Amino acid sequence: MRDAPAKGRRDAEKGGGGLSIFQKRDPPPSGPGVKRLTPKAAVCFTTPAMTRRAADWLGRLGGCRPLAILSDDCDDVVWQCTAEKADLLLMKADFTDSAEEPRDISACCDVAIEIKRRRPECRVYLICEDGYPKKQAALEKAVELKLIDGYCIGDLDPQQMRTWLDEATESMRAAESRDTEFRREEKQA
């Protein structure tokens, strides 16, 4: 037979209120009437470990719901961004000779084009390592042609990422207001 719990102890509470390493979070509200203010940020780096670290960093940074895309195959990335309804994709370009399949700017732009074709509201940003000054002109041209929405050479600092998240949030709001206006016009017609 079990003794009665001591008064004042945390584990004496009904419902198991004892100390837990894992905090229970309520799932975010969802459904047709709920507005989603935080963008889903998909991350796709050159290795699964780097992708996980980047997604964890985004989670700690806050202001988004991070999503790690562990495959770097173009079709997989496009499919997952589309299926998960990503609002932002952060990709790492890799120009090194040590990479099995170097992911150059052209390959990243191919992914970006397909994503924007299927999810026009998704913003795509590239991160590139320092030491490749010849690549900057190609990056600027990709932004000018609106193949990508921006890039960062070197380490991505939190302020730059917050700026990109803010841009994605604004894009979400603009798309939502267009949808609302369209629905209003349909009702009037």
Report residues per predicted region.
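Active-site residues of response regulator receiver
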Residues: 91-101
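Active-site phosphate/pyrophosphate- and oxyanion-stabilizing loops and adjacent acidic/basic residues
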Residues: 56, 113, 140
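Acidic, metal-coordinating helix/loop segments flanking the phosphotransfer/catalytic sites
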Residues: 70-88, 95
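Alpha4 helix (beta4-alpha4-beta5 surface) of REC/receiver domains from two-component response regulators
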Residues: 102-106, 110, 123-151, 156
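Conserved N-terminal glycine/acidic-rich loop preference
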Residues: 50, 85-88, 134-150, 163, ...
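Conserved phosphotransfer cores of two-component systems
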Residues: 82-84, 114-121
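Short beta-strand/turn micro-motifs composed of small residues
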Residues: 45-46, 91, 126-128
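Non-catalytic signal-transmission and effector/linker regions of two-component phosphorelay proteins
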Residues: 1-60, 67, 75, 158-189
